[in-house]
Amino acid sequence: MPTRKVIKLCPIKEELKIMKIRQARNINVIAMLNNLLIDNITNKQIIGVPLPKDMIAKFFIEWNFSGKDAYIDFLSQYNGLFFPEGLLLEASAHDIEMEVETFYDLCGRLERYWDITKDNVDIPKKFTMSHIPIADDAAGNEYWINLITGEVVFIEVEYGIPEGVHIVADSFSTFYSALRPMH
C-alpha cells in the first residue's frame, strides 16, 4: 500500500508570519554581505570601546523595533565606526544624495548627542522620545532610528524637524545594506 503524505494546512496568518521570518533572514544575509564589502574596501576606524552584547541589549530592552537585533549585533561588533572617505547611501527611495561618515558608539556619542538634542527647544520632545541618533555625515546631518517602527530617518540640519526629515530605510539592516564605498 503506498504511503500518503500528510500536508499540514497552515492558516493564512501563520503562512504570512513564516514568509516575514524568511524575508527578515534574507535581509540579514544581504546586510552581512554588504558588511563584508564595506569592511574589505573602505578605510574605517572603530571609535568606541568594545561592549558585551548583553550590556547593549539592556540599553535597548524597553524598545522592540524592527531591525533591533541587527543594530545590536552591529554595535556589539563595532560600537562606533568612522569612515574618513565616507559611505554613500544608494538613492532608491529618496531624491537627495546622502553620505555616512560616522556611526555613533554606545556609551559615548550616541547618548551624548541624544541628550543634547533632548535639551534643544527647537526639536519636538515627541521626536526625541521616539527616536535615537545612530550616525551622521560630514556636514553634521544625522541619521536616527525610530524606536517604535525601526525606520531610519535622515535629518537635514538646515531644515530641522519636521521639514528636514526623510525616511531612508525601513530598518537598520536595510539602511546598512544600502551603503556603498564613496570611491
Task: Describe each region flagged by the PLM.
Residues 141-147:
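Broad, structure-driven detector of short, well-ordered beta-strand segments within folded domains
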Residues 136, 147, 156:
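Pocket-edge structural micro-motifs
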Residues 6, 10-139:
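A surface-exposed partner-binding patch
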Residues 129, 147-152:
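Short, solvent-exposed coil/turn segments at beta-strand boundaries
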Residues 134, 164-169:
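Local beta-strand/beta-hairpin segments that build beta-sheet-rich folds
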